[in-house]
């Protein structure tokens, strides 16, 4: 949103992101090295093993200063066959989605004059704690009435221990942008290794959809990391191994005989969300709000593709305009 609507980042702001990016890289390699022994994998060489010992000795926090020796250790490890094998099994342990991107680009990133690109910033990740507000104005298309619409967006922490804070911003919300990583269908939660990430997201969507404070809010669901999902399927991962009901879903009447597993996986995930919005649930006796007429849009997106997000924002305009017209009694 910042890139699209608030003039992006200054060079100073880009440089402020460098420690975050270095931490992402270090955390990724630290996790890979930690899980080599757990998965019973071997390093390609003694040199790689020594590099791994060095990374482990630093702990899970990146060093304050990235020197040449550190960079050599990271590059040696990323070129090691054993580490690559570990990466291929990363669905078995928590690992940042941006791991491959940053390690593939590490030589560029480790340059002393490095300034993060927009794509680097989009790939970086910092766990959100608390609630953060961003305010911006967007021109409303003439077809939707023209003028300028001010948006106040709240970024809330998604971890389980952060969710009790959400209620602070629920009242008066017109639209909920709910992000689900469809590429996480084969992974478990960091907080609970027994729980599938996608199933957790579906459960959370149900609780937010049914929240009485959001009864009049429209929903836009970003089914994000579509590219990650498609890459995993090409590599031989199958959602049916984690959601057995996918098999029955695929046995429903199909158009033609061609079966595209990526396409059907997307349909399956979206249908699970649609089913949730159609569920009946017990309402508080004091709550007379009609939940049945809310809008819910679904978009499969790639987080680093701003054109995807731009298209989605047309839905936000449409949704808020529709709500404003209803409030004026014209609908």
Q: How should each PLM-predicted stretch be described?
A:
Residues 297-300:
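Conserved beta-strand scaffold positions in the cores of enzyme catalytic domains, especially
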